[in-house]
Amino acid sequence: MVIKQGDIFYVDFNPSKGHEQKHRRPALALSHSLLTKFIGLTIVAPITTTSRNFPTYHELTSTRTIQGKVMLDQTIALDLAARGVSKVEERLSQEELKLILDKYKLLFDMED
C-alpha cells in the first residue's frame, strides 16, 4: 500500500523519548509519495486531541472521523511498512493540505 501526501492513518510512535509523541495515534503524511518510493520513509505529523493551542498546531476541519490538531513541531520520518500501517482512515481536502504545508514551510524560514 502506498501512503500519499494528505492521507491520515494510525501509527505507533513508540519507542520515543522525552517530549516526543508516544503511543498509537493518528498521523498525517506530509511528504510526497515519491519520497516513500525511493527511500522507504514518509514524513508524518502526529495528530493530538489536546486543548492546547500552539502556533505549530493546525486544527483539522475537512475530516469526518479523525478529529484533532496536526502537530507540525513533532514531524518525523518513519518506515510505515515496518510499523504495520495498512489502512488509510481519511484523506484531507486539497485546500486544507495546502494550508498545512504552507504553515509547515514557515518552520524552516530563515531567521533574521
Each language-model region and where it sits:
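Hydrophobic alpha-helical segments and helix-packing faces
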Residues: 2, 20-23
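Compact nucleic-acid interaction/catalytic patches
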Residues: 22-24, 28-62
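Short, charged beta-turn/beta-strand-edge "cap" motif at the junction between a beta-strand
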Residues: 14-18
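C-terminal terminal-subdomain/extension
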Residues: 1, 64-112
